[in-house]
Amino acid sequence: MMSKYPLLGMTLIELQSLVKRLGMPGFAAKQIASWLYDKKVTSIDEMTNLSLKYRELLKQNYEVGAEAPVEEMRSVDGTVKYLYPVGENHFVESVYIPDDERATLCISSQVGCKMNCKFCMTGKQGYSANLTAQQIINQIHSLPERDKLTNVVMMGMGEPLDNLEEVLKALDILTGSYGYAWSPKRITVSTVGLRKGLQRFIEESDCHLAISLHSPVTAQRAELMPAEKAFSITEMVELLKNYDFSKQRRLSFEYIVFKGLNDSQVYAKELLKLLRGLDCRINLIRFHSIPGVALEGADMDTMTRFRDYLTTHGLFTTIRASRGEDIFAACGMLSTA
């Protein structure tokens, strides 16, 4: 039996094209979008303001396309990791992180990743497939705690800018008035920085941007992150200086602090020099040990000194709380290999 096409993940423009093709009235596109993204139905039969005739017409070749997680793991700190099926024999993980006043979902954009960052388990897994907009949105749509969500971060498996078409479609659905109607301020997209994709993302999306930095020294960053060789951090910073980050959109840099590698005041000074003139902030991240990697994380005292030095020199810096390490859900630990 031929599988049906998912409606979930379609933008309003795509839904308008669909209803026109099926001979349905134009206003049906917004009705379908409302059922999908506002009322969050799981079947076409629930779309009761569409006539029975049109529901049956849709059902011939289409379905909502919602897929529940097939596995969950719960951390002692309340973090929950979910496993979603995506296509044949592929899976991705997403992580729900509840906090006092906010609840964040960390979602994936690819099965595996091509970037091969030295410190990341997803990179060790290698790349298998891009996620479709439907598979990206489904991580939110089918989340059991969906109604508690306040923020989404695209910091799970994969490099979002390496799957930019589908990522931009998903962001359009999340922020569009026809879709989830979220403020872009509730969404952060993280990237190693791909030249072509970065420029397009900044120009086509108002969501927050987080750059994986991890070293201000080109040679060292290239060793940690091969993507540095294609588009250096110094070139990236020069590109970013062409845009205004002082208003709605926030620009941040992620910096894993490794013991004896990038944790001294010398590196803090290099960071200040590199980022001078950019309206941005730094998030310091504790390294979470992964199998087969000899790197170690700096201790909290070292991270605190590093943060305080940057902050006193005018660069707003925070230490990100580590969550879900006991279930391999913390930063850099996601893998479905």
Task: Please place each PLM-identified region on the residue numbering.
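Auxiliary Fe-S-binding modules of radical SAM enzymes
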Residues: M1-V92, K241-R250, V257-A337
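Generic beta-strand structural signal
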Residues: V80, V92, A103-I107, M115, ...
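Canonical Radical SAM [4Fe-4S] cluster-binding loop centered on the CxxxCxxC motif
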Residues: P98-Q135
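Short linear Ser/Thr-Pro motifs
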Residues: S75, S108-S109, S190, S212
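Ferredoxin-type iron-sulfur electron-transfer modules in oxidoreductases and energy-metabolism complexes
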Residues: Q134, N138-R146
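P-loop NTP-binding catalytic core
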Residues: E88-I97, E101-R102
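Conserved AdoMet/S-adenosylmethionine-binding subsite of the radical SAM
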Residues: P144-N151, G156-R320
